[in-house]
Every structure is written in structure tokens, then in C-alpha cells.
Amino acid sequence: AGNLKIAAQTYRSATANDFWPGPLSSIGTTGADTCENWDRFFIVKGVDIKEHIRAYEEAVGLGIELDPENIPDDLKKYPARGNPYWSEYYDFDLPNDNQGLGAFFDANGDNNYDPKDGDYPAIEVKGCPTESNFPDEIVFWVYNDAGNSHTNTNGRPIRMEVQVQAFAYATNDQINDMTFYRYKLINRAV
């Protein structure tokens, strides 16, 4: 008895909630300030990724380092592991753990996101290369079930972190009318 853990949401109770914005710590905890800080969406435009790739390849061709001033802001604001520009835009830290956050193409394979090194946001699909896997728009957000009491189910928290990428393509067929979602569920209770 008392072992059942649950987090659920109905469509839609205006006052009851089992989920809150933001990542969890490696042991599945968070605080109100973290939830408040992460109550946002991170949007990256595909046209900015294409321009970034062009500028990076031009810098490499000239034998120079890419000037950070030439990196689009949406790439600098992207919540990926090790982003060196994060603190220029936000007053809170990125989590530093093995799960990372937003998926990205890692040009130099160092496992840290740095657009100056040719890195850019991408869609993470297991078994598929990330190098050319970017859409016309990516929206990333993260939420959890441990940020407060479960007022919808009255259940105990699972300590689940959910990282989401919504993405879309501008095309001349039915794909233009679709939005795709990639969910990464991380059980922080183990």
C-alpha cells in the first residue's frame, strides 16, 4: 500500500495540475525558482541554422574562428549542454548532467554545445544522423512532475522529467500542415 506513483493531466482542469515547468536535479528534485525560470519556450528558426552553417563554413574556409557576433541569438539562447552564451541571456544556470537538454549537432564531437565550433540545434532521432536533421522551426521546452503537489491526481511524484521538441517544416504538401513532437522521458527517481 502507498507505493503507487502517478502524474496525469485531464483535458483540462483549470485548477488542478500534476506537471510544472523545468528540469529536475539528478535525484529528481526541483524548486519553485527553477520551475519559474524554465516557464518558457525556446524557439529556433531553420533559416537561422542555415545562415549559421553558411557563416561557420565561410570562417573555416578563411582559416579563422567564427565571430560570436555572427551567431544568431536563437542559437545562443538554446538550452543545450555546455552552452557558453547561456548566461548572457538568462539569470539561471543550465543543468550539468549526462542527459543534457536540447538536442544538437556536435560538429567537433566534444559533447558540449558551442555554436562557435559549428554546433547547432537539431532533432534527436535514435539511429539517424543529426547533421542534416533540422526543420524550419524547433520549439523546445521541459517539464516535470516533482515541482509541487499533485493536485489533479493526489498521487505521489514519479520524479519524471519530460524534454519536448516540437518541430515543423515549410513545404508545398501536407507536411506543411503538420507539427511533429519528440518526447524524451527521464526517470530521475533511479
In which residue ranges do the predicted regions lie?
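A long-range scaffold signal marking pre-active-site subdomains of enzyme folds
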Residues: A1-V190
